[in-house]
Amino acid sequence: ATVGKTIRCRAAVAWEAGKPLSMEEVEVAPPQAGEVRIKIVATGICHTDAYTLSGSDPEGVFPSVLGHEGAGIVESVGEGVTKFKSGDAVIPLYVPQCGECKFCKNPKTNLCQKIRLTQGKGLMPNGTSRFSCNGQVLFHFMGSSTFSEYTVVAEISLAKVHEKAPLDKVCLLGCAISTGYGAALNTAKVEAGSTCAVFGLGALGLAVIMGCQAAGASRIIAIDVNPDKFRIAKEFGATDLVNPKDHSKPVEQVLVEMTDGGVDYSFECVGNIAVMRAALEACHKGWGTSVIIGVAAAGQEISTRPFQLVTGRTWKGTAFGGYKSVESVPKLVEEYMNKKVKVDEFVTHTLPFEKIHEGFDLMGAGKSIRTVLNY
């Protein structure tokens, strides 16, 4: 009944940086060629949403519909779309996979660039938006915009998942869990018996711990200044817990002493450039590798002494856990359904969509791991 028509629905609109989201009735236009319109069933709230809303994101455009960790059901498809049909269970992807660009053809990366330029400007690949509110155009966000009852995404930015997958759980595989899990398995390539340090114990850090454990790490040191995070870190597989506030010396020194010279792998899951440096310098001379996952504010730069790298440490970064998205997310959903990957344990709060502000408050206060909003 809605096919080919504009849908009026609720969305949480970010009118401007630094202002709270506002629940509005918006119009969502039908999908154009190569696009898919989705009814969102559930979405997680990620620090990246708050980061963009705060105005720290150099690519943040307003007014916009934020949200990038969702799952839903295909409502209709645009011209030429063959891989999806109405009723399919799907997860929108902020890292697409066109399969044709030089990035997609290179096994070393997952960073498809096919629609990068328009996505960064908050537009669909043809340079226009599908959202409006009272006649005003709203921008898209990260190619996903899940804080709306309906959204439109490019067909290359969508993964079809198992029809029986609980969408209010697997939505988290659209960002946090895949990113952290893959950082350990794909980017760092953690080996059995290794020692790992994870800085920051939000959803991302916990997913890294899960990845390190899956890889057979013998020691996983979890680091956070909020001791409330330690219990769940232990449940996820952390073997040691370190609160930098409990020590007079720098945390990297504490770790080097604890581990007879440093860790094999470290992961920065905060987005703080001082922590990024500490994570690198906690690595073992000769072979230690540090992976940056956290997103720092616009214009910030990382630093260390070149000698740290000259003496055999490696500094890397990762996006979406190195997973080529369209092919990997359905497999991760299957792994979850086969009890190989934890998802439920990340969900500490569930709220109805209209209580989105409460979800942001819980995250800001460090009281939640993930809040899932149900529509």
Curated annotation (Swiss-Prot):
Provide the alphabetized UniProt keywords: Acetylation, Cytoplasm, Metal-binding, NAD, Oxidoreductase, Zinc
**Which residues does this entry mark as bearing N-acetylalanine?**
1
Which reaction equation describes what this protein catalyses? a primary alcohol + NAD(+) = an aldehyde + NADH + H(+); a secondary alcohol + NAD(+) = a ketone + NADH + H(+); S-(hydroxymethyl)glutathione + NADP(+) = S-formylglutathione + NADPH + H(+); S-(hydroxymethyl)glutathione + NAD(+) = S-formylglutathione + NADH + H(+)
SUPFAM superfamilies tied to this protein: GroES-like, NAD(P)-binding Rossmann-fold domains
The record lists its disulfide bonds as none
Recorded superkingdom: Eukaryota
Q: Name one GO cellular component term.
A: cytosol
Q: Does the keyword Oxidoreductase apply?
A: yes
Cofactor annotation comment: Binds 2 Zn(2+) ions per subunit.
Q: Which GO terms describe its molecular function?
A: alcohol dehydrogenase (NAD+) activity; S-(hydroxymethyl)glutathione dehydrogenase (NAD+) activity; S-(hydroxymethyl)glutathione dehydrogenase (NADP+) activity; zinc ion binding
The record's note on quaternary structure and interaction partners says: Homodimer or heterodimer with H chain.
Name assigned to this protein: Alcohol dehydrogenase class-3 chain L
What species is given as this protein's source? Gadus morhua (Atlantic cod)
